[in-house]
């Protein structure tokens, strides 16, 4: 950095210096010249050298003026309009020419001038100028304060700046003229040329002092901030050097004592673990590569802990450690029957897998999906399967999972990265062939972080999961020996590609008799023990259990049933603890004392009391249920109103039913002109619950026919089926759940589509015997059976 050197003394003659009327103008771009200052200049180009030569031949005077654009080496030296109008006249003290059209000048500032007009532009600029005389200023307290403050600030700048010599501070304090002090400091400080030109053009000395004070103060703030940053950096460097020095000393002390280096010990331990672990070849190479990286790191570095965490995961996974499967099929069957009543289809599939495994030991594990309402034993059955197989059990819940990294893990580049939940589960199971339950697979979500269901495609595909790639591990892990069991309430929300990889086993709701046996065999003993009671202290009669099932619960599973049994057990436990009784035999008459009045009263038959009401059957994620359809007519203009939160499919079914009745009005017994001045309103009660699906078509049509023919639908009859405009009755799903719901409600007759006859095989024989099933193919058959005679 070139710093202008002020004169050691202010030449008094400069105050009476006479400025020529015409001056040669040299444009300058990177600096601003001030009076009283002496500084070197480098010039390049023949025209600049020619300008200086002519000035040297005359009076050695030049006008230095700041230009807004850099002077051109070719063409005009500068456009006149680019020049500022205030400059400094300087005297050339020394000229030293150099090779290559270069020269160096030493000049001294004499006085400010203002350009009056430009006279010539070629070969260089000449202008008529006038001298700017310095104001006569009488020092007052404000001027003295401004000068003192400026000198103090400048002194602090000198101390903080590595490029400015300390002599400048003493020189500034020796200057008595306010204008000279402002000019000299402006030429020295590291300010922009625009700011310096502003100081040059400020003729009011008081204002000039204020302006240069602001500039110096800003420069001081920058220097102080830089000094603070430098101090912090130096402290960090000193601490690092100190830590390094202490570690080296500690290392030397340990060597003198014969102790091994901690890093070497840890590396040796990991090497031993890797060699002893039965890793795959790919995993072994990756582990040794990471170990080699770790051996070159300092134990205090962040990367060192990342490497140790990775090696901990690699060496703790059960790469080839498996449990021995139970080959005794009879014992496995006994265990399954001990833990669960019914569920024959799921048990049969597990026994088949065991049989195949016994004949072909290297067979891959099945990927099952248990689908059914809540409380039907999906998760507990998976635990029972693990016990029957003699395997470890692990479960993760996928409900609400939105991040793909939950399945595949995070890449090691991220802070706090870990493997996904699949690999974490395998590690915790400590076996490469556990029974692995993915609970609530139908409730997996997706968002901007990825789609977990897509990541599960690799996990649940037997053709791919032998080389499952977790992002954190970075090596393939064999999942083909894992028995994956997924659970869901419905299949509709599972993506088709994922559903295709699952072997679906439906676990429908239980019948009343099945619930009774489950309560007697499992629920009552479990709650009795959970509440600290013995078999002698509490007993349930069969009538009491039946009343709890029918009067206090209405569900496909047995979860609420167990809660009600637990409530009775707690009530008895309270009485025994208070000394009121020593034991209790719970009969049907006693239930209301513990559970209150009966909550579930079947009013299905009473609800069908007049024309326009029909009873249908619905299937929901929680099991089957009754669905009532109500229809009414009023004067209007052939309008159809649908209420009850119906979905699009149900609305279309209602429109199809009305169109069928209108097109077959004569056959059904309805006047043809009846619809011309009539509005129809169809309502499905429980309006707060959204409803959709095609299976209510026959129920809607029956309700409309009942209304328009003024014939009631039989009150012990329910129906389900999809309809077409031609009156055909098409098959629907969920037959078992719907039939069981009707059976619980005491319905005796059910109308089913003809194509659903095959589904009766899944219904317990006791239920089939107690109910009458009518299979139809056409809506006319439905109306003949469902509508009572006039």
Swiss-Prot record:
CDD domains in the cross-refs: RecA-like_Lon (cd19500)
Compartments it resides in: Cytoplasm
A Gene Ontology biological process term: protein quality control for misfolded or incompletely synthesized proteins
GO CC annotation: cytoplasm
Binding locations of ATP: 372-379
Subunit relationships: Homohexamer. Organized in a ring with a central cavity.
Protein name: Lon protease
Gene source species: Syntrophus aciditrophicus (strain SB)
